[in-house]
Structures are given as C-alpha cells and as structure tokens.
C-alpha cells in the first residue's frame, strides 16, 4: 500500500491506484485462483478518515469485506486486520526518531499528538488469529496502547530537544481504532475486537460473533 499520509495528499492518483485499484485486482485474482483465505492489512487511519490515505484504506477494507459475497461458488474468504503504528516498520515514527537522535533535536508535529503503538509480533499474531477464526467479512482490531509522541521521543533520545514543526498535511492529532458508527456491530474479546459488517446481516451471525461481547447495543 501507499502509506505515507502527506505523500498521499500530494500524490492522490498514485494512492488511489495502489490502495483501491490494487485491492480490486487482488480480490479478483484470489477468487480466480481459488485462494481459500485472504487477510488484508489495514490501518487505524481507515477509522473515520480525514486524509486521502485513510479514505483509500477504508475503501480497500470494504472491497475485501464485499469480496466474500462476490466470490460466489469459489468460497474464498476475506477478512481484514487493523493495525496502529507498527514499531520499527518502514516509514513509522520510531525509526525516524532513531535516525534523528544523533542531532540532539527531534521534530515534533504537536505536543498533544498521540498514536496507537503495536509490536511486529503483535501484528503477526493478529493475522494468524484471523486466519484461524475468520468466517469471512470480519475486521480484527488488536487492543493496543495509545502513546504521546513526546513520550516516544523522550524514550528514544532523553536528552534531545523538541522542535515543534506543526501538523503535516492530512494528519490527525489523535487516531481511533474503532469509530463510533462501527461500535454498534463491534464485539469484544480478551485481547482484540472484531468489527462485523452490516451487509447481509452478518453482524448478527452467531458463527462470526463466536462468543464475543457486543460493545454498544444502542
């Protein structure tokens, strides 16, 4: 996916082609080749998106979810896992701060800014759980902490000064893993949530709910 938020704001056509057209091509290819199960990786920015990247990932998520009804007799199952910031991944804030630490000055967009953080291992575990649990149409969301960017910066370079540079195009102060509109068909489990789609009444399907507790009933 095209995943850098400001880059997507300045290059919308490439972002749409990669994240939306690419998802459509992948759904078609998996169905054509008879793939049994597909788990797509998504992002917290797809929840109530305000930037182009988040909007394209929201569309991508919906394409994969709808692929379950589109697959027909092939019975290809599609599900989605929603990540926060994967610590250490390419383009994320921690590797950037590490590269800047020797300069003794870290650029901070806004002192109030927070981000959800998860480890690579947590991300991999969530994917494997999705493969084991999925019926088709689920969005799996890991329970992960939200951290202040200033706390992350201090953990990496305690002595470094912070230079306030302002929020970049398309960025939010605070992300959310699950939007208010999704809460009515979101179920809670020990270490994750599962958002079930409203289409085809799948949010009421006992096989998909699988002993989950409804987050919001009204």
What is the predicted function of each stretch?
Residues 1-17:
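NAD(P)H-binding glycine-rich loop region in Rossmannoid oxidoreductase-like domains
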Residues 38-43, 81-83:
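SDR active-site strand-loop-helix element
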Residues 53:
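Catalytic tyrosine of NAD(P)H-dependent dehydrogenase/reductases that use a Tyr as the general acid/base
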